[in-house]
């Protein structure tokens, strides 16, 4: 009997849910309309990178989004919450000052610093998912006052160090690089800031899915697996973009389908690949 209790009690304790984040509101009722949330990773606590899934949920946020060294929440595959991680990666979006809707990014010293949009890691698009493979460069808008917000790619490889702190901001749409408006001659509304340059959505950012105009909630995909919204479907003969090599496809070869349920991006593999990264 003693052996039974020695086994069963630790088992029960191991799966007991932590409720610390569950009832926290995601809505910031400040002077700027915004949503504050961490993209939650589903993974195996024994080896966080082992069973990480493609889909993440927004159901908690940093307990202090001005602190670049704060712990962040992580939802484990079993369905309960833990507090995991300690050092968000350089580039995580952070709030510059408590009570103010001004954002920057965490630098290598752990400070939240302000930069203009071209050089920073950006205000991020309101999304409900991201792949477990990403890049730290943000999407940059092509035109002023575009309706959709902006995206930040992340690398949530480990439970507790998934760096997806996202903000949706519909009012303050003025974080634009001056050369971003003339970057894309094909009128594709979004591009990615990469190595100080503004690149078209058909380029590097396509690895993570394409942000489509007039879609409020999208998800980003790694090009191999589709998520709930903002699907990026690669045809069998297409080249899958990866983090190590940049393959570029002219944005005019992308077809957007929006049935108000899914946004699917199809690659036209009949057209030759072209390098549009230099705009």
Curated annotation (Swiss-Prot):
Origin species: Pyemotes tritici (Straw itch mite)
Keyword flag Transcription: no
Disulfide bond is among the record's keywords: yes
An annotated GO cellular component: extracellular region
UniProt-recorded name of the protein: Toxin TxP-I
Chief location of this protein within or outside the cell: secreted
Function per UniProt: Part of a complex mixture of neurotoxins which P.tritici utilizes to capture prey. It has contracting-paralyzing activity in insects.
Tissue: Posterior glands which appear to be connected with the stylet through a series of ducts.
Signal peptide, first to last residue: 1-14
